[in-house]
Amino acid sequence: LSRSWLLVNAATPDVFAPALASEADSVIFDLEAAVPEEHKDAARQHVVDALSGGMTAWVRISATSTDHWQRDLEALTGLDGVRGVVLAETEEPEQVTFTAMRLRAGTPVIALLESALGIENATAVAKAPGTFRLAFGVNDFRKDVGVGEDPLAMAYARSRMVIASRVGGLPGAIDGPPGNTDGEDAVVDSSAVTASMGMTGRLVLNRDQVDWVNRAMSPSEDELAWARDLLEKHAQGAAVGDGSYLPRVLRAQKIADLADSYGLWNA
């Protein structure tokens, strides 16, 4: 389970190795928004060269409504270095399924929801064959809907994605990135909002922000101590005090599972 998903411009292959050497849990080579139209073909070839030459990464591919979608899929199919794809501008469940069908069997597809229609169809997309996780295209969503960046204004969309992920049996949703120039305090604060909404990962545009996102998205030392104490007592047969006991045990187990997936539980 990845906390940080670092997006890097596929048109500048010199950033691939530094990104993969960073603290990012996952790296995404971006063939879509970051790449100007005139550089699409060259960027696609850079990705093919990297993923057939020993590197492994996710790839953000173009929307199904574009000519580049088919070209991206043709280039990526069969490459051993493809960890999965992020499908831009997902709005319908069939878009994910059609994408998955054109890739090597078992290749995971992250559906990037970037519009009102995408959020409205979040549950159907989450349940679609081929969907691995949901991710939030925050900036494009704000442009489409006309809402501000205040957490309260974005709470409904984030909640819809979290609930849809749960209904679809998926891992927690991935939130959009902090501002590219945000400093540590701003990144930590906004990532705390992400975590409080029930999301378990976040896109990142700036490599310098990765460590801050990882820390903010991880269970705190206090949470880990509380979970260890409760789970130890539960394992020793602690008496059920009231109706809140079992929900607290489940919460503690969720913290333990998250921490274990991040390599923190036995650290």
Positions of the model-derived regions?
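Expand to "…catalyze enediolate/carbanion chemistry for C-C bond making/breaking, isomerization
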Residues: L1-A267
